[in-house]
Amino acid sequence: MLAMLSSSSAKYSKVVVTERTYACTDGVKLSTRHWSNDFESESNLRRTRKILCLHGWLDNSASFNRLAPCLLENLSLGSSSSDDTIKENVDIIPTEIVALDFPGHGLSSHKSVDGPPQLLAEYAYYAAELIEALQWGDNGSTANMVDGKTTHDNDTQQSETTINDNSGKESNKIILVGHSMGSGVAIVLCAAFPEWFSGLVLLEGGLVARSANDASRHVRSACQRRLRSNRTLFPNVNDGTSTSSSNTRAKVYSNLEAAIKARLSTTERMPGDQTLSYEAARDMVVRATLPANKNDNDNEAVVFRHDPRLQWPSLQYYTREQVKAFMRDVRTSTVPTCFLSAADGWPTDAWIESVVKDELQPVHLKRLSGSHHFHADPDTVGAVAREVVAFINELNS
C-alpha cells in the first residue's frame, strides 16, 4: 500500500485547484479539474495517492467541488475526523483528485457528427485515455496536454503545469469514484482494467440493465430520434461547414440565475423525492453554460453548452446478464468496493440491489441521508466524505 510521509518531511499548506485540457487521439478535448494538497517536502513525493472522479449524466466535474476538498482535508488528517483544523504534526499522504468532464459535458468538446454521443463503453474509453495522459494506473503511455492553469484556492495567479512522472506500481494504483452514470462507467472500466485500481467507490449508481427482448424496439427508437434530430442539429453537414453539434438553437436564459432555476426545476421532475441544493446546482450550471452572445459583454443571457444528443436514447444498452458479468468481474478481480446510496435518491429496483449484494459484494455498503446529489449538497457531503475516507483508510490498513 501507499507509504505515508512522516510529519517531519511534509507540511500541509492548502488545496491547489488546477484546470487542464487534454487532447485525445480522436480529436476530442477532455477538460479536467484537479485538486491536490499543497505540501512542502524534502523527500521524494512521487508516491501520491490518486483518485479519479466520474460524474453523472448531464452533470460535470463541478459536482465534485465540495467532496474533493473535503476528502483532501480528512485524508490529510489520516482519519475520518471532521475537525476543520489541519494540524502541523500529522502524517500526510500527498493526494491528487482528478474529475473529468465527459465528452459533451462541462467544458469538454462534443463528439463529431458521426460519433456516438452517448455509449457507456465510450465514456470508459475516454476515462482510460485520460488515465494514460496522467500516467496513472501502471500505464506508461502519454497523451498531449493542450493547456494547464493552476490556482491556489481563490487566488487569480496562474501558471503552466505539467503531467507528473509517477513511478512505482503500487503508488500508481487509482481509487475510482463514480456518481450515478459515472458509477456505471466506473464498474465497466474497473472490470476491464482491474490492475489499474486499488478501490472502487460508487455513489448513487451502478449499471442500468434492460431486457434483451427489448433490443430491437430500443434500436428502432434510437434510430428514429437520431434521424429526426440530426437534420436540425447539422443542417449544413453535407457542405462540410458543420462538423460538431451546435448551441445556436439552444434555449436562451436571461441570466445565470434563470439557468440555475431551470436546473433545479429539472431535478423536481426526476423520479422519487429528489432534491438539489442551490449551491450544488450553481456549481454545475456555471460550468455548463456559456454566454448566448459572445460579442455583447453587457448581455447576461446564457445557454447550456452540453451536447443536445446526450438526451437521445443510446443505440446500445447492457442486458442483465452483462451487468451481472461486469459486477462479478470486479469482485473476482479483488478490487474492494464501497457502495453508498441516498435515502431520497434515485429509485432502484430490487433486482439491481440484489445483484450489487450478490455479484459485486461491496465491503462497504451504506445508505445515507440526502438525495441523489448527496455528494454535492453542502448539508450531506460531510457524511459522504466520512464514509469514503473510512473506506480508503481501510485500504491502507
Task: Give names to the regions the model predicted.
Residues 188-191, 198-255:
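Flexible "cap/lid" loop of the alpha/beta hydrolase fold
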Residues 25-26, 33, 38-39, 90-177, ...:
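Active-site loop/oxyanion-hole signature of alpha/beta-hydrolase fold enzymes
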Residues 290-358:
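Conserved serine/cysteine hydrolase catalytic core
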Residues 8-29:
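N-terminal cap/lid segment of alpha/beta-hydrolase-fold proteins
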Residues 239-320:
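Conserved alpha/beta-hydrolase catalytic His-Asp/Glu region
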Residues 371-381:
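Catalytic histidine-centered segment of alpha/beta-hydrolase-like enzymes
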Residues 33, 38-40, 44-110:
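Conserved HGGG/HGGXW glycine-rich cap/lid loop of the alpha/beta-hydrolase fold
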Residues 178-182, 186:
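Gly/Ala-rich beta-loop-alpha elbow adjacent to hydrolase catalytic centers
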